[in-house]
Amino acid sequence: MSGSVAAGAAAGPVPPAQEEGMTWWYRWLCRLAGVLGAVSCAISGLFNCVTIHPLNIAAGVWMIMNAFILLLCEAPFCCQFVEFANTVAEKVDRLRSWQKAVFYCGMAIVPIVMSLTLTTLLGNAIAFATGVLYGLSALGKKGDAISYARIQQQRQQADEEKLAETFEGEL
């Protein structure tokens, strides 16, 4: 009895990323974009903090915080000095792709709203792109071009038949 319970617990529910049909290479692409976004946010945030303008400093601190959160969520092995790093990463992995997209894009927009400079734009571009990648995965895979063309052709034939019936009815 305990063996079957342990086996059921080990299998557990399928993570949402796999439910949505996210391929392994796309998942790694999103993670890589998250890590690169964290690095760009951290470096740009440090440059932003070297100023006397208070909004630039606030945006720089926010960007450094974004970098830490991105690393914590996407690459918890980089944050092993934080005791709860793996717990946070597991909880983030259970989120749906659209939730990650909103979270990452929202985090990247805040410093740009605080201080619209080239440093904040370039620093948050990759972090925002990470959110966009997760958003695209939330949209899912659409049909291929051949099936789309076939559907369009069927619609066009149906429209032509309706038009022909309309003209025959007028005569």
Swiss-Prot record:
Extracellular side: 53-56, 123-124
Name of a matching Pfam family: Cg6151-P
Primary residence: membrane
Cytoplasmic side: 1-31, 78-101, 142-171
Subunit field text: Interacts with adaptor protein complex 2 (AP-2).
UniProt membrane topology term: Multi-pass membrane protein
Organism of this sequence: Rattus norvegicus (Rat)
Record protein name field: Calcium channel flower homolog
Membrane-spanning residues: 32-52, 57-77, 102-122, 125-141
Record flagged with keyword Cell membrane: yes
Cell compartment(s), UniProt: Cell membrane; Cytoplasmic vesicle, Secretory vesicle, Synaptic vesicle; Golgi apparatus; Vesicle
GO biological process terms on file: vesicle-mediated transport
Keyword field: Cell membrane, Cytoplasmic vesicle, Golgi apparatus, Membrane, Synapse, Transmembrane, Transmembrane helix
Highest classification ranks of the organism: Eukaryota, Metazoa, Chordata, Craniata, Vertebrata
GO cellular component, one term: synaptic vesicle
Function field: Transmembrane protein which mediates synaptic endocytosis and fitness-based cell culling. In response to different stimulus strengths, controls two major modes of synaptic vesicle (SV) retrieval in hippocampal neurons; Clathrin-mediated endocytosis (CME) in response to mild stimulation and activity-dependent bulk endocytosis (ADBE) in response to strong stimulation. In cytotoxic T-lymphoocytes (CTLs) facilitates calcium-dependent endocytosis of cytotoxic granules (CGs) at the immuno synapse.
Gene name in the database record: Cacfd1
Domain of life: Eukaryota
Disruption phenotype: Knockdown in cultured hippocampal neurons impairs Clathrin-mediated endocytosis (CME) in response to mild stimulation (200 action potentials at 20 Hz) and activity-dependent bulk endocytosis (ADBE) in response to strong stimulation (1,600 action potentials delivered at 80 Hz).
Tissues with expression: Expressed in calyces in the brain (at protein level). Detected in cultured hippocampal neurons (at protein level).
InterPro entries, sorted: TVP18/Ca-channel_flower (IPR019365)
Family membership noted in the UniProt record: Belongs to the calcium channel flower family.
